[in-house]
């Protein structure tokens, strides 16, 4: 994410002339998986970078106030508001305790499984104002760790999934549907497709951007910049 933001904020006039590649690492790297990159086969990723097959892809942009100034942060995968960002927060904390990424991720999921905390939220999507107590919102240029499974990182659109609080039995069915890539069929999930999202309010909700916790003050304005950067993709 730092590399993407470095490119997007550089003084280079045509940023698509800069190509970047991915050597996947970590847990749940579904942006890499979308392109067929295997976390366990870094040698193949290096070979693909050397072969240099290029594809222009979209870049998401989040405008916000960081407490001192208005600023922007760019992303390739997704922004989470609420539960998804809490998982990032807790997994970072438990990683310091456990020392193992996989164990910290599973521990954070378990700790939050029964929390199902709701946040008073006000969104504006395609001119529609959405108000209510919402568990999590995912705004994805790509698949967003499974919550925006229909998103395509080069179609010029943002996919949005607004998730309301499920009953406990619905939570388990939702987890199964998430793993199967069918989360949009869950009755507590409302999907949208748009080019701009305004998050006017999400009371006490954490926000993560491509796995980073964002120090922010609402409102947020999330937009998409079509084919703004060049990715080296597998053959």
Cite the ranges covered by each PLM segment:
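Aspartyl protease active-site motif detector
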Residues: 1, 24, 211
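Short, acidic Gly/Pro/Ser/Thr-rich loop/turn segments
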Residues: 83-88, 142-147, 167-170, 206, ...
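Catalytic core of DAGKc-family lipid kinases
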Residues: 5-138
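Gly/Ser/Thr-rich active-site loops/lids in small-molecule metabolic enzymes
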Residues: 95-103, 150-170
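Phosphate-binding core of ATP-grasp and ATP-grasp-like enzymes
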Residues: 136-145, 151, 181-182
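Anionic-ligand binding region
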Residues: 119, 148-149
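ATP/nucleoside-binding phosphotransfer catalytic cores, i.e., glycine-rich phosphate-binding loops
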Residues: 124-126, 131, 155, 162-235
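Short, well-ordered alpha-helical microsegments
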Residues: 3-5, 145-146, 216
């Amino acid at each position: 994410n730092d590399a993407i933001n470095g490119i997007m904020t550089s003084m280079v006039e045509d940023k698509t002339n800069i190509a970047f590649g991915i050597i996947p690492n970590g847990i749940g790297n579904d942006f890499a998986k979308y392109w067929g990159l295997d976390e366990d086969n870094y040698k193949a990723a290096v070979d693909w970078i050397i072969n240099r097959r290029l594809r222009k892809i979209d870049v998401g942009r989040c405008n916000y106030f960081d407490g001192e100034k208005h600023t922007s942060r760019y992303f390739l995968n997704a922004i989470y508001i609420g539960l998804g960002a809490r998982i990032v927060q807790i997994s970072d904390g438990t990683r310091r305790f456990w020392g193992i990424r996989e164990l910290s991720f599973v521990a954070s999921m378990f700790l939050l499984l029964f929390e199902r905390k709701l946040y008073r939220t006000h969104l504006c999507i395609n001119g529609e104002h959405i108000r209510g107590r919402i568990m999590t919102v995912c705004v994805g240029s790509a698949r967003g760790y499974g919550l925006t499974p229909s998103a395509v990182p080069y179609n010029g659109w943002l996919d949005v999934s607004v998730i309301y609080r499920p009953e406990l039995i619905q939570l388990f069915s939702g987890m199964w549907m998430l793993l199967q890539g069918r989360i949009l069929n869950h009755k507590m999930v409302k999907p949208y497709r748009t080019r701009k999202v305004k998050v006017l309010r999400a009371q006490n909700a954490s926000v993560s951007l491509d796995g980073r916790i964002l120090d922010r003050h609402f409102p947020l304005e999330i937009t998409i910049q079509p084919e703004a950067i060049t990715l080296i993709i597998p053959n």
